[in-house]
């Protein structure tokens, strides 16, 4: 097989799309990724780069043009790296995304599951409720060029909300008027790194300036410009990020004006969103995604469910509608605070939130001897660590619902789950990111069925060959849990769910008032005899909730 030569032209047909949204052709048995290509087009392809296992090229002549090709509707397309599919019609984009998920599950995951029809967006424009504009060293505000960190100034983006574009224009005015320098990644110098905008369904915005320092010059004037540009802005926050590299979010935040968080309503639940909290960027499609996750969970009202990587607790509260109890885990402290606040505001009582990574949450569940019926995971693009998958399998849930934003790592993780006995049963792609290569997927996994079974006929009652019912009752009594519910367990539960602490004496007082024994905390009993404060009504209800949770009452 002769090697492809750089700067040579070859003729081939585009077969499909790569994970990066490029066309895929095969020339002399070698894979070539082709820019600005559409499936089915017969092209003369100029090879521009040749690597060991793949080459890159671009079409210089089309002998046939796909009916799915369209003129890009954005003047920045091809320079800005934000979109990948503006040269395709939406039907072809959806085909490409579903096929990408199918290929990942089949080739990488070794699964025979068929991906169901992709759930496309009714509105593929102006859908992003979170905008992140990098600022260059020469104070350009826009988006990165494809596969680089060179900023392309973009005044109007078809993916962002109009408020975000207006706020970006106000920042440009501020940088120019007050001679404030942008940040240079290569030298670590400069001040303004990113403009971050969150917008809710009502059109209100929360603005954050990420800076390489502790403050900005002319902060009052900046706030005035931003509020003038987007009058429905509810707060302006300064995020401090002095770390080298390209990380966006800050280590700490200071409110310059207004609120430090935004509220939104998703799936009928009010959600509190501070700057670091994870929240899906496409509101209508997020409701579709979470609805499908709830369907796959198959809840009946009796289950204990766990939501790992819970972010601001949106999926947790959705699951809580149909589960007995839901535990959410998240490593970002601000997100946990938002999740607890949202649950309290919504009156959702059958949830609790634990701060920590997925492994920490799994360890806490094991310590409490809790075995969830359903585990839902929604990890970042890197997917699940092997030890997290092992921990999930060790808890032996009946179902695992995997929400993924990267088909590649999803396929890898599906294979790891299969090695531990959990097979993919259903899969559906949901388009939360129209005009880009990114796609969300929901996969249902459950433990594989046994290889065979034996039919056994059992007769209950007295007599030869029958099983006495008295023996069954006796054995059942022997298998009852002997775990003692400690005051420490009750206190930890309340702190995790409600975000406040309770004194041991408060628990003892509530137990006493309920007529429960208190012999396991003699010091608390002694404290009840002394003059002291009594628990508030809120804490009494929290203690009762914990006692119900552990089956004490």
Question: Can you name each region flagged by the protein language model?
Answer:
Residues 1-76, 306, 352-353, 360:
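Terminal RNA-binding accessory module
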Residues 2-8, 218-479:
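Rossmann-like S-adenosyl-L-methionine
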Residues 23-28, 142-145, 210, 339:
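Short, acidic/hydrophobic/Gly-rich beta-strand patch recurrent on exposed beta strands
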Residues 60-72, 78-182, 202, 216:
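Extended interfacial segments that mediate partner engagement and assembly in macromolecular machines
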Residues 153, 197, 203-212, 270-274:
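Short, aliphatic-rich beta-strand segments
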Residues 486-498, 508-514:
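DNA-recognition alpha helix
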Residues 518-531:
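Short Lys/Arg-enriched helix C-cap and helix-to-coil transition segments
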Residues 532-553:
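Phospho-regulated, low-complexity intrinsically disordered regions of nuclear gene-regulatory
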């Amino acid at each position: 097989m002769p090697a492809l030569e750089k700067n040579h032209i070859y003729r081939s047909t585009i077969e499909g799309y790569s994970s990066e949204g490029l066309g895929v052709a095969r020339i002399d048995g070698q894979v070539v990724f082709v820019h600005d290509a559409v499936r089915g087009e017969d092209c003369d392809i100029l090879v521009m780069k040749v690597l060991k296992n793949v080459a890159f090229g671009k079409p210089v002549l089309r002998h046939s043009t796909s009916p799915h090709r369209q003129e890009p509707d954005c003047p920045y397309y091809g320079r800005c790296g934000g979109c990948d599919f503006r040269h395709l019609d939406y039907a072809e984009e959806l085909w490409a995304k579903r096929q990408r998920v199918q290929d990942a599950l089949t080739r990488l995951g070794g699964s025979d599951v068929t991906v169901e029809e992709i759930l496309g967006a009714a509105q593929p424009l102006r859908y992003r409720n979170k905008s992140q504009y990098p600022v260059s060293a020469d104070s350009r505000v826009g988006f990165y060029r494809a596969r680089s960190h060179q900023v392309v100034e973009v005044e109007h983006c078809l993916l962002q909300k109009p408020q975000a574009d207006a706020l970006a224009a106000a920042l440009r005015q501020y940088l120019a008027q007050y001679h404030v320098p942008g940040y240079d990644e290569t030298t670590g110098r400069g001040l303004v790194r990113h403009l971050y905008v969150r917008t809710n369904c009502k059109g209100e915005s929360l603005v954050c300036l990420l800076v390489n320092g502790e403050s900005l010059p002319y902060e009052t004037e900046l706030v005035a410009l931003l509020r003038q540009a987007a009058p429905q802005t509810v707060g302006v926050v300064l995020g401090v990020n002095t770390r080298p590299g390209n990380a966006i979010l800050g280590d700490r935040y200071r409110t310059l004006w207004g609120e430090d968080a935004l509220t939104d309503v998703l799936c009928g639940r009010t959600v509190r969103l501070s700057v670091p909290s994870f929240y899906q960027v496409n509101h209508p499609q997020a409701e579709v995604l979470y609805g499908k996750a709830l369907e796959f969970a198959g809840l009946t009202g009796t289950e204990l469910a766990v939501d790992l990587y819970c972010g601001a607790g949106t999926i947790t509260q959705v699951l809580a509608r149909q589960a007995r109890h839901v535990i959410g885990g998240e490593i970002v402290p601000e997100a946990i605070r938002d999740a607890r606040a949202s649950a309290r505001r919504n009156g959702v009582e059958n949830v609790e939130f634990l701060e920590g990574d997925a492994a920490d949450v799994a360890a806490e569940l094991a310590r409490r001897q809790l075995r969830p019926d359903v585990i839902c995971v929604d990890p970042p693009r890197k997917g699940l660590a092997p030890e997290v998958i092992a921990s999930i399998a060790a808890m032996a849930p009946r179902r695992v619902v995997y929400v993924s934003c990267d088909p590649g790592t999803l396929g890898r993780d599906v294979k790891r789950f299969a090695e531990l006995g959990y097979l993919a049963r259903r899969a559906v792609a949901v388009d939360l990111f129209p005009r880009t290569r990114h796609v969300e997927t929901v996969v249902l996994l459950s433990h594989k069925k046994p290889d065979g079974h034996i039919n056994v006929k059992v007769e209950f009652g007295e007599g030869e060959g029958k099983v006495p019912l008295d023996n069954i009752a006796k054995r059942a009594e022997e298998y009852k849990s002997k775990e003692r519910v400690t005051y420490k367990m009750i206190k930890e539960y309340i702190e995790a769910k409600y975000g406040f602490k309770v004194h041991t004496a408060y628990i003892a007082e509530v137990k006493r008032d309920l007529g429960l024994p208190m012999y396991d905390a003699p010091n608390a009993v002694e404290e009840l005899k002394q003059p002291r404060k009594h628990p508030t009504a809120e804490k009494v209800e929290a203690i009762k909730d914990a006692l119900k949770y552990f089956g004490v009452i």
